[in-house]
Amino acid sequence: MDELVHDLASALEQTSEQSKLGELWEEMALSPRQQRRQLRKRRGRKRRSDFTHLAEHACCFSEASESSLDEATKDCREVAPLTNFSDSDDTVVAKRHPALSAIIRGKQHSWPESDSFTENAPCRPLRRRRKVKRVTSEVAASLQQKLKVSDWSYERGCRFKSAKKQRLSRWKENTPWTSSGHGLCESAENRTFLSQPGRKERMECEAEEQKHGSDENMSECDTSSVCSSSDTGLFTNDEGRQGDDEQSDWFYEGECVPGFTVHNLLPKWAPDHCTEVERMDSGLDKLSDPTFLLPSRPAQRGYHGRLNRLPGAAARCLRKGRRRLPGKEASMSSLGTERIGHTISDPRQTDFWLPSAGKRERNQFNPLSPLYSLDVLADASHRRCSPAHCSARQASVHWGPPCPRDIKRKRKPVASASFSSPSPVHPDVLEPAIPAQKPPDSEWLDGTSAAEKATAFPPATFFKMPQEKNSGCSSSPGTNGC
């Protein structure tokens, strides 16, 4: 028997060495991915105990045969006493395979008690059974006891929940049920004592919770979610959805103007007892609000600020219809405005010099030039700060017969004709033509004052040819000359 054990151990060593050499040879020929797989297989083999491999090689028998069972028991019973009283060769085998010797010495099998050999055989690996974790009845009972809420705590939670619902719904109605000073923050003593409708709701809540017994943990979370929503004074319909806080918080952070809110747009956010007609009425009332969908005051202030920063022409185009000029355009120099006023009122003055002004101030006279027939000229030697020279333009005057039907317009065609007549007329030819074209009712015109005449007929002297300016004026001051 000693020789048999020695031969068996040597054969096992040879087979293990051959298998290792074969695996090394295969790994040399395999790809890196397959080598990783082989390493994983090796790690799995190392986790198993060595005696399983030895027992697999030693006990090569069919599981269903009774003869193999008898042979296995005989071999194990014969090997066990021999290992205790063996020579030095057996000690060498025990040193080489300590797991095998230990399992053979200490393992005591209950062969006659088992129905099948496969359940109690030491050769079977037990790694697959580790994956299956069966819960015993005691563990299940303890878990149920932990999950199950006691009657007192359950009634208390349901009572709190119904009380909060009551307070929130009645706060929505603005009824004097809740005290104005405390609001929603009441003491715990007042929560326990409920009125008759509160008790009815508690009974209904208990009946619903008995139907849905699996949602007991969710009900506790619902009370906390209602508490968090009641802090802001709002009741959101997010029961059973703990992750909806991010979606429901931003609706009531702030409004631009009092208009439509989600509470009125979405019927789910309204109280449960409100009818559809009331919801429709509230929505129509909000639609009739004049401030519906209007920008907020900060937005309006920002718009006006951007409008004021625009240049004059663009701002005027945007303000079309309001006729409101910005303050910057009215900042024309007072001396320039006085000179323009004197030039317009004085019929003898045709050109004048403005004080030194920059380009921005000279550009402010450009809109006035078509209105008063002015040419704004600047000295080219000093472009940055040069005096502006305003001269009156020559315009052709065509005297038409005045309309006898409208007496009020007898003084106005003179000025209008001076701007609209296309044919140029020399002023020397114009002077003798004026007394010849007197209307029949000239007495009315003669009755006017001298100042009125000067203002009524400025184009006759205001628009002069540039050649006449150089030649000078030799006419008497009584005539309409320079």
Swiss-Prot record:
Cytoplasm is among the record's keywords: no
Region of interest (Disordered), ranges: 195-222, 408-482
Give the Phosphothreonine positions (modified residues).
T91
InterPro entries from the UniProt entry:
Splicing_assoc_domain
- Compositional bias, Basic and acidic residues, is annotated for 198-215
| The organism's place on the tree of life at top rank | Eukaryota
Q: Where is the composition biased (Low complexity)?
A: 414-427
| Name of encoding gene | Gpatch2l
Provide the species name: Mus musculus
What S-S linkages are listed for this chain? none
Q: Which UniProt keywords apply?
A: Phosphoprotein
Q: Which residues carry this modification: Phosphoserine?
A: S31, S86, S88
Q: What span is annotated as the signal peptide, if there is one?
A: none
Segments of skewed composition (Polar residues) = 468-482
> What is the name of the protein in this document?
G patch domain-containing protein 2-like
- Organism placement in taxonomy: Eukaryota, Metazoa, Chordata, Craniata, Vertebrata
